[in-house]
Amino acid sequence: MLALGKLLELTLAGREPAEKTQLTVEGVRMRWLSEGALEVRPPEARDNGLDLLLSAGIHGNETAPIELLDRLLHDIARGDLKPRARILFLFGNPEAIRKGERFVEQDVNRLFNGRHEQSSGSEALRACELERLAASFFSLPDRQRLHYDLHTAIRGSKIEQFALYPWKEGRQHSRLELARLRAAGMEAVLLQNKPSIVFSSYTYDKLGAESFTLELGKARPFGQNAGVNVSLLETRLKQIIEGTEPEMAEQGLDGLQLFSVAREIIKHSDAFRLNLPADIENFSELDVGYVLAEDLANTRWIIEEQGARIIFPNPKVKNGLRAGILIVPTTDENLA
């Protein structure tokens, strides 16, 4: 196996490779760009025009997605997986990955779309570097652009594997991409309706990629991810990489639950209180009239929406950040 296939090993050790560029027997070029960043380029005759960005480890304790990318890289470096797409592999927050922590000082996934410019520290610099790497990768004209940012969650979920689909004014969500997600094992997709400061939103909004945050299960340490079943996703990623995806039929959305954002719960002060059990699962339903959260100046969030569910509840976020998202079921009538 080519040494550059061991990107995770290099990243965990904080080392640079002796050789920055290597070629497989079939002529696939692997090029180390910077810490946790590796570009894979197929021979020109095999290139099918897809640029695929795969990122994981934006949160350092979410190891199942990191292990998945590591397996794909090993397969490419051994010549077992023969890419027809250009691929950029990114391990998002190497420092936090080495520590086994979600982040060191700041949540990197709250520092995109200009937010890192208002901050300081190593993680703000890393968010800036990730934007630069993605922008450079997606700079070639007349190519398809696809980005999957892979995560696991800090809590359990009634729907274990789901995706978040960013939003941009004047751009419709793609039915074809949703069918692809369904084939990759996603059970639900949250169709967002406003700009965001996460990585997938940056590549969708600024770089024109079809971009998604994928949540794959519960966050666990390295080597303890047997309970996180990514087999469907892994199979689909290999097919995308090799250009062997089956045709996706119109009924490809069967069984895929669609949700839209009703409201974001923003924590304004240290007095903020979220009236939910600490172990509540993502996608838990909330009754109309329930007082979800309270803050200063008699601010209260009361459930008004039928069928409302909560995802990503986290009262420990910094003031000014999102402490949860209220979502409601939606239909596929506005898809492109």
UniProtKB/Swiss-Prot annotation:
Molecular function terms from GO: hydrolase activity, acting on ester bonds; succinylglutamate desuccinylase activity; zinc ion binding
Function: Transforms N(2)-succinylglutamate into succinate and glutamate.
Gene3D superfamilies recorded: Zn peptidases (3.40.630.10)
Provenance organism: Pseudomonas fluorescens (strain Pf0-1)
UniProt keywords, alphabetically: Arginine metabolism, Hydrolase, Metal-binding, Zinc
Segments crossing the lipid bilayer: none
Note on how the cofactor is bound: Binds 1 zinc ion per subunit.
Catalytic activity: N-succinyl-L-glutamate + H2O = L-glutamate + succinate
Binding-site residues, Zn(2+): 59, 62, 151
A biological process from GO: arginine catabolic process to glutamate
Name of the protein in question: Succinylglutamate desuccinylase
Family indicated by similarity: Belongs to the AspA/AstE family. Succinylglutamate desuccinylase subfamily.
Pathway of action: Amino-acid degradation; L-arginine degradation via AST pathway; L-glutamate and succinate from L-arginine: step 5/5
Active-site residues, as the UniProt record annotates them: 215
Entry cofactors: Zn(2+)
The keyword Zinc appears for this protein: yes
Enzyme Commission number(s): 3.5.1.96
